[in-house]
């Protein structure tokens, strides 16, 4: 049972694919709304993953960003009953329920029916530690805070698994994100009643945070990722005939900046105008995915050195030899896709966990660069700053650029090793399967 959103459904589906590929006796019932079945129902998947639907009684994916708080409330209050009805219709009760951590009621449903629940947290273990330890933040006077407070330069150095971090980098603690956090805080309480905790990360990316959870909970904690379907890239090359791949094939190696601001919340119109001017004036080749504003963006970028598309196969594009950098909103899926593809990341976070992901990319893993706001909580990053950063980021001949690309390749190898035979995540997925199949 994933949270109904692209950044949650994708890693959950990739986890389920990994499970059924390993055990021929496993069958997965993957629960989505009728609307989401329309989005993903035709995507390739193993035969032993079956979709089951809940009615469209929550706001549409197409408008949920208009009132995200109302969308969250709908998921948390309207879907529990139809989910239970779906369980009643199954031929036999499931061996286990894997539910997104944000689905607060899933653990309650499993407990009532004596079905063990594995809580699947779809972003970094580090930010979950921040959430779980919000009382520590409060005791230090760091939660909640207002963006204007002078203490934003103070350092948070007491959260397990989180390296010393400026309060201003934890934007989840104030403003709109604070409202969202207060709603989800209940789900972190339910987490203690789960039977397993799963992460989409590799242990090697976040050892301190994952060690914290392993010691904190008296149930198994498994890092299972990166849950990036690299094995699917060798199957079906029909996409090579698409015009955008033909364009990429014509570009020099590592010369193109891939730009994607994600599939949900994006930047303001004023900020987008600054980004457009900055990228255009940087004079680099670019491949820009614009969900919803393709025509307008094409007009604004007419005569520049790139292409604009409304959609692309992101992982295949990132793995193309022409791609030399990835401008990203820092959603965790995209972050892991970039790292696994060996592509440096240019961070432009917008919301929620993305700011902390950006910090880890730039400061901890050192596989990218980010905009440095000259003023705390600066709302608009101007085109001149963007232009200079893009030029610096795409300069593969500078010592800084060479080092960043070397580190990215090294981290890519580490992540691929985690999911390879005998790797840390490979072993964890095997252990999880043994756990849930022992229950039968």
UniProtKB/Swiss-Prot annotation:
Gene3D superfamilies: Glycogen Phosphorylase B. Pfam families: UDPGT. Keywords: Glycosyltransferase, Transferase. This is UDP-glycosyltransferase 87A1. InterPro entries: UDP_glucos_trans (IPR002213). The keyword Transferase applies. Its EC number is 2.4.1.-. Belongs to the UDP-glycosyltransferase family. UDP-alpha-D-glucose binds at residues 263, 312-314, 329-337, 351-354. The keyword Transferase applies. GO terms for molecular function: UDP-glycosyltransferase activity. CDD domains: GT1_Gtf-like. PANTHER family: FLAVONOL 3-O-GLUCOSYLTRANSFERASE UGT76E12-RELATED (PTHR11926:SF1494), GLUCOSYL/GLUCURONOSYL TRANSFERASES (PTHR11926). SUPFAM superfamilies: UDP-Glycosyltransferase/glycogen phosphorylase. The lineage of its organism: Eukaryota, Viridiplantae, Streptophyta, Embryophyta, Tracheophyta. It is an enzyme of class 2 (transferase).
């Amino acid at each position: 049972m994933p949270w109904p959103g692209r950044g949650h459904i994708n890693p959950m589906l990739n986890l389920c694919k990994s499970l059924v590929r390993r055990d021929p006796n496993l069958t997965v019932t993957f629960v989505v709304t009728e609307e989401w079945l329309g989005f993903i129902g035709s995507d390739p998947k193993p035969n032993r993953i079956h979709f089951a639907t809940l009615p469209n009684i929550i706001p549409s994916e197409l408008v949920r960003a208009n009132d995200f708080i109302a969308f969250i409330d709908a998921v948390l209050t309207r879907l529990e009953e139809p989910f239970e009805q779906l369980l009643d219709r199954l031929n036999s009760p499931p061996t286990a329920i894997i539910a997104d951590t944000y689905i607060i009621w899933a653990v309650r449903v499993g407990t009532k029916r004596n079905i063990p629940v594995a809580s699947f947290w779809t972003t970094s273990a580090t930010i979950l530690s921040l959430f779980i330890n919000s009382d520590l933040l409060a005791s230090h006077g760091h939660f909640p805070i207002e963006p204007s407070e002078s203490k934003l330069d103070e350092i948070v150095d007491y959260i397990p698994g989180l390296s010393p971090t400026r309060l201003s980098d934890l934007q989840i603690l104030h403003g709109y994100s604070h409202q969202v956090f207060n709603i989800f805080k209940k789900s972190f309480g339910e987490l203690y009643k789960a039977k397993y905790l799963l992460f989409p990360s590799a242990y090697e990316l976040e050892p301190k945070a994952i060690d914290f959870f392993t010691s904190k909970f008296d149930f198994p904690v498994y890092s299972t990722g990166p849950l990036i379907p690299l094995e699917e890239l060798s199957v079906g090359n029909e996409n090579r005939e698409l015009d955008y791949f033909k364009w990429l094939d014509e570009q020099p190696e590592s010369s193109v900046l891939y730009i994607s601001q994600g599939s949900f919340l994006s930047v303001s119109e004023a900020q987008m105008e600054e980004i457009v001017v900055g990228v255009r004036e940087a004079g680099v080749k670019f491949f820009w995915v614009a969900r919803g504003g393709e025509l307008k963006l094409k007009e604004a970028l007419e005569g520049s050195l790139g292409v604009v598309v409304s959609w692309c196969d992101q992982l295949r594009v990132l793995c193309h030899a022409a791609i030399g950098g990835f401008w990203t909103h820092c959603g965790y899926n995209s972050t892991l896709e970039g790292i696994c593809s060996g592509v440096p990341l240019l961070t432009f976070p917008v919301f929620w966990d993305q700011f902390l992901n950006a910090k880890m990319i730039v400061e901890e893993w050192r596989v990218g660069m980010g905009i440095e706001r000259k003023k705390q909580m600066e709302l608009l990053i101007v085109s001149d700053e963007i232009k200079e950063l893009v030029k610096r980021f795409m300069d593969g001949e500078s010592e800084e650029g060479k080092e960043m690309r070397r580190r990215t390749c090294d981290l890519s190898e580490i992540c691929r090793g985690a999911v390879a035979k005998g790797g840390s995540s490979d072993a964890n997925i095997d252990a999880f399967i043994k756990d849930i199949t022992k229950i039968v």
